[in-house]
Amino acid sequence: MTHISGLRYAVFDPKTAHWLETAHPGGSQFAPLDMPLSSEPGEAWAYGMSMEWAGHIIERVSGMSLGAYVEKHILAPLGIQDATFQIETRDDLKARLAGLHAHTGEGFTEIPYPEPLMRPQYESGGGGMFASPRAYLAVLSAVLNGGVSPTTGARILKASTVDEMFVPQTLNVPDQGALGSGILPTAMPAFSRPIPLGSGKAWTLSHLTNLEEEKGKSAGSAEWYGLANCYWTIDRQKGVAAIAFSNALPFGRE
């Protein structure tokens, strides 16, 4: 959850990208949970496959699929109906699916969604769910409201759990990686540009946080991103949660 497991996404790490191309040339099918460590656990912060493993652990402990667990404990209590890991089983959501676009240098071209997203081998805790912006905001609103949905009144998290989610967890990690350099590097420029994280950042149990006040953002605010330039933030001091989704690659293109 803190991304110090030693697992890294290939798009941000040359060593993992090299392994992926060598072991699975041309993007052949592979089991993401079989990806090797890029560093020893606890040694360095690196954005990667940790949440995929967290989702897998939830499945093993609960005896439920990740989708069923999320439906029971998050989606249903929040009144969310437009979110799923299995988009091919939801014709109603497929009909509303926003196009995925890539910048070619002369403009944007619509491209197909990757097959592992449309027909997943497993339900990915790191980025396998399709959801509407309204559904995503319903989750953020519950977190902003101390774990209680302001719409349904259902509690999905203890208030103390929400507080713990905002506590920096990486300040004593020996290798701060991108948190220290302020730049999340890229190994696959077609998918992501180098991402400026800025200085004075840490990772919590769930997100990037700024240790000091920034322009328009209170100290201790939450933020993170999706690869297709999808952004979210929570500022608890100001009582604001916000999203901005473009659904376009590469990540970080200005």
Across the structure, where does each feature detected by a protein language model lie?
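Short, surface-exposed loop or secondary-structure junction motifs
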Residues: 1-216
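Short, well-ordered beta-strand elements
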Residues: 231-233, 239-248
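Generic C-terminus detector
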Residues: 248-254
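Short, small/polar residue-rich loop motifs at catalytic or cofactor-binding pockets
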Residues: 226-228
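A conserved acidic, glycine/proline-rich C-terminal tail/linker
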Residues: 218-221
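Extracellular/periplasmic catalytic domains that process cell-envelope and extracellular macromolecules
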Residues: 198-200, 234-237
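Hydrophobic beta-strand positions
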Residues: 57, 233-234
